[in-house]
Amino acid sequence: MTATPKPLVLIILDGFGHSESHEGNAILAAKMPVMDRLYETMPNGLISGSGMDVGLPDGQMGNSEVGHMNLGAGRVVYQDFTRVTKAIRDGEFFENPTICAAVDKAVGAGKAVHIMGLLSDGGVHSHQGHLVAMAELAVKRGAEKIYLHAFLDGRDTPPRSAKKSLELMDATFARLGKGRTATIIGRYFAMDRDNRWDRVSTAYNLIVDSTAEFHADSGVAGLEAAYARDENDEFVKATRIGEPARVEDGDAVVFMNFRADRARELTRVFVEDDFKDFERARQPKVNYVMLTQYAASIPAPSAFAAGSLKNVLGEYLADNGKTQLRIAETEKYAHVTFFFSGGREEPFPGEERILIPSPKVATYDLQPEMSAPEVTDKIVDAIEHQRYDVIIVNYANGDMVGHSGIMEAAIKAVECLDVCVGRITAALEKVGGEALITADHGNVEQMTDDSTGQAHTAHTSEPVPFVYVGKRPLKVREGGVLADVAPTMLHLLGMEKPQEMTGHSILVAK
C-alpha cells in the first residue's frame, strides 16, 4: 500500500520579481507578513527568469509563456523569439516554405498580402523587426499590395510608445517602395485571451472590412488622435488608415505574433468554418499563416512548427505513477497547463486541472484580488484531503495588476497574495507537506518608469524569489535559473531526474 501523499506545492507568483529599489515597488510598499516571515525563517534566494537563462536573447525580459516552459521542462528552452530572429538573420526566414507558399499563391492571383501582429519592440508576443522582415519577404516574392494591420502595445512597452514603431514601418514601406499601414488598434481588442468576443469582433471587422470608429491619413496621425481621446496604446480604438484595405478571397494573411495565447482567438475567427462566438459579416477564404502553432486544433499552417519536449515534469511524474493538480484562473490557465507541459494541450495520466474563471472586469486594477481567494480555497481543500502528490498553481495578480500601472491596485494585489500563501503554508504544515514559492518573471516590483516618469506596465529583467517551505535542513545555492525548478521538485520527491532535464536542484544540504 502506498503512503498517503503529502503534497509538494509549486506556487508560481506571476510577475513577482525582486528589486532592492523602493521607487514604484509594490512589493516593498505592501504589508506582507507571511512572505516576510518565510524570508526570515526558510531557505531562500534569487533565481534568474530572463535573457539567455530562459532561452531568450541576452538582456530580454522574461514573460509568462517562456517562464512556464522553462519551469516545467527542467531545461533551458530555446524560445520562438530567438528561433525567428535567428532565421531572419541567417536568411532562412525569406525561404520559409509555409509563408512563401501563402504569399506566392496570393501574388499569383494578383491578390494582397496582409501582415498583422503586435507592432512593438517588447519581444513578449512579437517583435517589430519580424514585421519588417515579413514586409521585405512580401516584396521579394513580388507582392504589389501589402497591408499592415498594427496592434499597438503599451503593456510590454511604455503606455505611449507606439509612435516610433509606426514610423519604423512607414520608413520600411518607403524604402521598399510598396506597402502601407492599413489599420491600427490596441492589443486590448485584437489580442484578447479571455473569450471577450466583443473586443475580438471589433478587431476582426476592422481588419476584414475596414469597419472603424475613426479614420486617419497616417498611422501616426491616428495614434495622436487616440492620445487626444486619452487612449493609451493598448486601448487605441479601431482606426482605419487611408483608403479601405479589405481582406478578400485569395489574399494572404500572416499573423506575426510568435506567442500563442493571445493570437488564438483572432486566428479562430479567420479560419474556423464553424466559428459561432459571434456572427461574422464575412469570412474571406484566405491563405492564412500562423507564425508559430497557436494550437494544434486550429486548422491553419504554422511557419515555425512546435518542437516537442520529452520528459517534461508533468510527463515524468505521470510515467512514475505520481498524481498532480494544475490550477489557475482563466488569465494564466494556459500557462500552468499548455506551457508548463511543454506545449501539450492534453493532461497527462493522473493529472487533474481546475480552472477558476477570472473576474469579468475591464481591467484588473478594478479587482486586484482577481480570483486568488477562490483558487486558494481549492488548493487548501486538495491539501487537506491529500489528493495529489504535486500541486502546481499560478497566481495571476502580480502580473495582471502590474500591467495596469496603478500602484495602489498593485499593492492590494500582492497583499492578497500574501494572505493566500499564508493559507497554503498553514494547510501544508498540518499534513507535513512542502512548498516551493517562485515566479516566472518580474513586473509588480517596478510600477513606475524612472526614465520617463510614466507608469511602468511591462515585465522586468529582475531576478525572482525562490523559497523552500518545509522542515528539511537545506539551503539555496547561488546561480539558479527557472530551468532548475523541476529538478529541485524531483529532488524533494526523492526521484532521479531524467537525462533530458539539464537543470540542477537549487536546494543543497546545509
Curated annotation (Swiss-Prot):
It catalyses: (2R)-2-phosphoglycerate = (2R)-3-phosphoglycerate. GO terms for cellular component: cytosol. Mn(2+) 2 binds at D14, S64, D440, H441. It is an enzyme of class 5 (isomerase). Its EC number is 5.4.2.12. Pathway: Carbohydrate degradation; glycolysis; pyruvate from D-glyceraldehyde 3-phosphate: step 3/5. Belongs to the BPG-independent phosphoglycerate mutase family. Its cofactor is Mn(2+). InterPro entries: Alkaline_phosphatase_core_sf, BPG-indep_PGM_N, Metalloenzyme, PGAM_B_sf, Pgm_bpd_ind. Mn(2+) 1 binds at D399, H403, H459. Binds 2 manganese ions per subunit. The active site is at S64 (phosphoserine intermediate). Monomer. This is 2,3-bisphosphoglycerate-independent phosphoglycerate mutase. One of its GO terms (biological process) is glucose catabolic process. The gene is gpmI. The keyword Isomerase applies. Substrate binds at H125, R155, D156, R187, R193, R259, A260, D261, R262, K332. It comes from Pseudomonas savastanoi pv. phaseolicola (strain 1448A / Race 6). Keywords: Glycolysis, Isomerase, Manganese, Metal-binding. It comes from the Bacteria. Catalyzes the interconversion of 2-phosphoglycerate and 3-phosphoglycerate. GO terms for molecular function: manganese ion binding; phosphoglycerate mutase activity. NCBIfam families: pgm_bpd_ind.
